[in-house]
């Protein structure tokens, strides 16, 4: 459009110029004759006009070519910018996905450790003499009793998963072990109904530990191993050990309300051998707990266990049913805690039936080969800021029939006392004295006692 206007303007300019020249010539000559343009002049003017039109056309072509080049350049720049932006967008998407995983995943750990001195004595007659054995080693040393590493991932508001490993080191045995203590998928459908599939906390022991508060100093009474004192092949569990499992493989249903007049419960159907043993058997075991809190600071709970503890296998020997009943009454507020736990068990060690005659625990019916009654009482008081004093006393009476069906007895007494200090929110230290004394079995007198003093600690993150 601009080139056409320019052509018209040039032509008009040339016409006006020619007309002015002719007018001037006419005026100077003062001749009234008519102005005429000869053919040569007209041809010259047409040639000039054609030349100007050619120049305008050439200029227009150059301008259009330049405009096309600018468009191509802009497109190329845009393509480069898009190409440069795409990796950034992909990286951003990957970072968003990673952030989502990180935000919904929690990694933590708990370590129980101690630096103590042990004095262990045992014997069958006379005064016990110093001797290493039954889980005790004389001398001074540092132990990492437990180290739990936990990964917890939340898929959504309902589903989550947990993996907890259990590492322990025993300096007396110079060995380490690593197990999967918890590995479960959880569906939380309501505060009163959560289900877990896999290895998870059992109903009783972890529940008592929360109210006790000093697990890093000592296991609760049903989780404590009573080493030594029993001999013979009737104890399939390898002697008098713990009377329960803190975790096992199976299906677990649990729920709770909060505040005053609240309830809590858990029912677990499990393999029966604990989290360290995935052994399959012909039947499953069950453990349950029900608790009631008239006020938030107090709980009254009962529990029970029944099963073969994984010993009922195909073409195996006949079995008995192991049972355990539990009761807990506890109180805990910001300054004071106290509790009493009681349990009664039958056939906990003697699952497999053995031939034998004579009197003894349930020998006439051939049903009960061992039974135990135990109780534990504890208290603690936070008397100043991070400082607290605590004490605990355990008593166990254990009876069993030996291979000739003669009843034998074991009596175990344990107590500890100490003072604890919360160094940090996640670091606790305690100066503790422990005493354990075992007597029996009476048919072949056997005794041992252990005194231990030192520091116990718990680090969590």
Report each predicted region and the residues it spans:
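A general secondary-structure boundary signal
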Residues: 32, 45, 52, 59-67, ...
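Short linear Ser/Thr-Pro motifs
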Residues: 17-20, 257
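Solvent-exposed loop/turn segments connecting transmembrane beta-strands
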Residues: 168-177, 244-246, 275-283, 317-319, ...
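Outer-membrane beta-barrel pore domains
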Residues: 5, 36, 71, 119-122, ...
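N-terminal periplasmic/intermembrane-space "pro-region" immediately following the signal or transit peptide
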Residues: 6-7, 12-13, 21-126, 461
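N-terminal secretory signal peptides that target proteins for export/translocation
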Residues: 1-2
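Outer membrane beta-barrel
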Residues: 95-124, 129-272, 280-287, 291-302, ...
């Amino acid at each position: 459009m601009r080139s056409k206007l320019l052509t018209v303007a040039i032509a008009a300019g040339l016409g006006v110029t020619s007309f002015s020249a002719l007018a001037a010539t006419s005026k100077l000559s003062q001749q009234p004759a008519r102005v005429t343009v000869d053919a040569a002049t007209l041809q010259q003017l047409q040639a000039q006009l054609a030349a100007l039109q050619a120049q305008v056309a050439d200029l227009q072509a150059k301008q259009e070519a330049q405009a096309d080049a600018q468009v191509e350049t802009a497109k190329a720049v845009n393509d480069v910018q898009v190409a440069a932006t795409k990796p950034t967008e992909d990286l951003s998407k990957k970072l968003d996905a990673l952030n989502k995983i990180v935000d919904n995943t929690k990694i933590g750990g708990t370590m129980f450790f101690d630096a103590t001195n042990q004095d262990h004595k045992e014997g069958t007659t006379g005064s016990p003499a110093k001797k290493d054995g039954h889980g005790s080693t004389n001398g001074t040393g540092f132990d990492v009793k437990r180290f739990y590493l936990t990964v917890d991932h939340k898929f959504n508001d309902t589903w989550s998963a947990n993996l907890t490993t259990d590492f322990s080191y025993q300096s007396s045995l110079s060995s380490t072990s690593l197990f999967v203590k918890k590995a479960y998928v959880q569906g939380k459908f309501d505060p009163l109904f959560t289900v877990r599939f896999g290895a998870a906390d059992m109903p009783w022991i972890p529940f008592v530990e929360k109210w006790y508060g000093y697990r890093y100093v000592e296991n609760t009474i049903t989780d404590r191993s009573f080493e030594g004192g029993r001999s013979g092949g009737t104890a399939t569990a390898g002697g008098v050990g713990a009377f329960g499992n803190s975790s096992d493989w199976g299906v677990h249903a649990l729920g709770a309300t909060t505040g005053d007049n609240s309830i809590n419960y858990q029912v677990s159907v499990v393999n029966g051998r604990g989290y360290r043993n995935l052994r399959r058997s012909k039947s499953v075991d069950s453990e349950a707990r029900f608790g009631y809190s008239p006020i938030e600071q107090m709980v009254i709970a009962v529990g029970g266990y029944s099963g073969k503890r994984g010993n009922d296998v195909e073409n195996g020997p006949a079995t008995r049913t192991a049972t355990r009943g539990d009761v807990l009454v506890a109180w805990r507020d910001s300054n004071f805690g106290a509790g009493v736990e009681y349990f009664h068990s039958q056939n906990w060690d003697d699952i497999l039936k053995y031939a034998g005659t004579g009197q003894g625990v349930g020998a006439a019916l051939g049903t009960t080969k061992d039974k135990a009654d135990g109780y534990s009482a504890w208290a603690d008081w936070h008397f100043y800021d991070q400082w607290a004093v605590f004490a605990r006393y355990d008593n166990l009476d254990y009876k069993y029939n030996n291979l000739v069906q003669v009843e034998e007895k074991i009596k175990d007494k344990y107590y500890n006392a100490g003072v604890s200090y919360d160094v940090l929110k996640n670091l606790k230290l305690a100066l503790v004295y422990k005493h354990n004394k075992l007597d029996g079995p009476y048919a072949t007198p056997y005794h041992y006692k252990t005194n231990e003093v030192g520091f116990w600690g718990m680090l969590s993150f």
